[in-house]
Amino acid sequence: MKKAFITGISGQDGSYLAELLLEKGYEVHGMMRRASTFNRERIDPIFFENPTRFKGRLQLHYGDLADASSLNRILRTVKPEEIYHLGAQSHVRVSFDIPEYTADITGLGTIRILDAILETGINTKFYQASSSEMYGKVQEVPQTESTPFYPRSPYGCAKVYGFWITVNYREAYGMHASNGILFNHESPRRGESFVTRKITRTIARILAGKTKELALGNLDAKRDWGYAKDYVEAMWMMLQVPKADDYVIATNETHSIREFLDESFGLVGRDWNEYVRIDPKYFRPTEVDLLIGDPSKAMKQLGWKPKTSFKELVKIMVYEDLKMEGLDPEKLMKL
């Protein structure tokens, strides 16, 4: 039975990846920080909804990306054949408020894991979660694996470091270490501070009579949005091929926040203009340009392709947030 280790297992991507690997018969180990409260809402269903389904094949370990000794301990204990490094301080706007912490966790956390692989001597394959935010002030459209990086946030800068140190260790030590340059990917498990989930969550609260307003920043910002559940399949595929490499994972489509508002509010028959208020605090100090990824390489070499359209993604998110609010999406949505 293959063993996999996931950092950031309690996040959107980590929880979907854990489910995928468990379905494929893996023993899955995840790392969580010890804290006074635990964010386990995304992974608790795996444990409790059907406890016999995975027969104890999901285990959690205490550790921290700021603590190299904990990473060494976990790798020596687990000896995973595959490592998926998803853990990070991943909110772009917040990275301007805590740049040093972002650099430490998102940037240096990567080299701590790579060094732990070397020090423990385990034979493993490594996946690094890179980001389209590395392109920032884009140098060409669409972006490919060879497009120069020009990050526009502390988060983007930290991810550039993580990308290049992964490439460096691959070349210097012969590691099977791959970068997945993932463009924006959303789901009902997306954190509520991210704009897409903030929109769909607020729609549900509006219909439940709990709020009347949605505060947003730049409505003209454009992103290449995909479905997180599709994207974790690409992560797994990267570690199944003989040679490590770097891949753009994207839909090759771009949509504005304004379009997301049109689609999501339209599903429940509401005009978003009646609820949205522009708040300057949600504008980034430096905004990225047009992010649109070309996934041709991943499609050709891995056989991966996005399965879920933009409209389908928005529908999934609105549907699930209405359910979470105790509402009936079948009655409220234009399906």
What are these model-derived regions, one by one?
Residues 1-185, 229, 239, 308, ...:
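N-terminal Rossmann-like NAD(P)+-binding domain of SDR-like oxidoreductases, especially those catalyzing
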Residues 17, 23-24, 30-38, 55-59, ...:
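C-terminal substrate-binding subdomain of Rossmann-fold SDR/epimerase-dehydratase oxidoreductases
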